[in-house]
Amino acid sequence: MARIIDGENKNLIGKNLKRIRKKAKMSQQDLSNKLELLGVYVCRGSISRIEDMSRTVTDIELYAIADVLSVDLKELFE
């Protein structure tokens, strides 16, 4: 598991988010659009930065991402 504070990794879900999103055959833009329908505004570029772990993720974004991808929240952390 990535260290929580290491100067580079700003979240713990990036790699899993990318894997789960691709498994769902969803583009970053698709994910962004679906999040927007829930009132959570995360642009495609921000999703890219989340996936490469260079951007933090809010708790609201986490719950919305799990909802859009139809996964349990803990799956994003495994």
Residue ranges of model-derived segments:
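Conserved hydrophobic/aromatic packing and binding residues within compact polymer-binding modules
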Residues: 17, 31-32, 47-50, 76
